[in-house]
A protein has these predicted regions:
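Glycine-rich flexible loops
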Residues: 1-154
Length: 154
């Protein structure tokens, strides 16, 4: 876990310090280790990941159960003492991270991607660029459980 957590902190800092990938407290990253999902805390900056504790441990099984019930408001930090010490709360995108099968998930807000996404012909533009890649276009939905469900159903 220590090496993986160090890798998470390092890549989070790298992308958090690149204005083309992340602006302010936007974007989030996560690491899955056994039944724990370490996800960036709400309101924290990825660029602070080396010098500050910005990750929150949550129970992956609980997140999955809450996704099924459409209610992430019941999500609690896995280690209550951890939350009391650091006053951190999981990102609104915790469900999205839990649904992804990958050990590491990097959810960024790349300026170039966003500028294409808002174009009236953005989807057609992306179709030309990614014709040999398996991908999905998700029309805008609110962040959180709605986005996670849209991705899950795509």
């Amino acid at each position: 876990m220590d090496r993986s957590f160090s890798e998470l902190r390092n890549i989070s800092s790298q992308i958090g310090n690149n204005i083309d990938f992340v602006q302010g407290a936007g974007g989030n990253t996560s690491l899955k280790e056994n039944n724990t999902l370490w996800v960036k805390a709400s309101g924290c900056w990825l660029s602070d990941s080396i010098n500050k504790n910005i990750f929150v441990p949550v129970d992956r099984e609980e997140v999955t159960r809450l996704i099924e019930s459409n209610n992430l408001s019941d999500l609690v930090v896995k280690n209550v003492d951890f939350q009391k010490e650091y006053f951190l709360h999981p990102s609104i995108e915790t469900a999205l991270h839990a649904l992804m099968p990958h050990k590491f998930v990097l959810h960024i807000h790349a300026v170039n991607a966003l500028s294409i996404a808002v174009l009236s012909n953005g989807k057609k533009y992306v179709e030309r660029l990614l014709q040999d890649i398996n991908w999905v276009w998700i029309p805008y939905v609110m962040p959180g459980i709605q986005l996670a469900k849209a991705i899950q159903n795509a």
